[in-house]
């Protein structure tokens, strides 16, 4: 096996920043359990990184994504009813998207 060092990699981006992460577990009215980590960062134009910790699926989401048909179903592999309930929760926590120049 070839031993590689950091100089062998061509980094396109490499940065460190302070983030805020909210960990929340809840059960929807339809009895679907969600264990989420919702990370706020200076990246992603104000959108948040939402991770389903039970299944290891994540997406960068903002309020506009919640209005797009099929986004939550596709990313988190859930049905339409579960997606509607998740969207109702995420609407409360995602906040507005902030675009910069």
Description of each model-found segment:
Residues 17-19, 31, 52-53, 84, ...:
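Amphipathic alpha-helical interaction segments
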Residues 26-31, 41-43, 66:
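Generic structural motif
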Residues 63-101:
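Mixed-charge, Lys/Arg-enriched low-complexity segments
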Residues 1-35:
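Negatively charged, low-complexity tracts enriched in Asp/Glu with abundant Ser/Thr
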Residues 1-2, 36-45, 86-90, 100:
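Short charge-dense sequence patches
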Residues 38-64:
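A short, structured beta-strand/loop element
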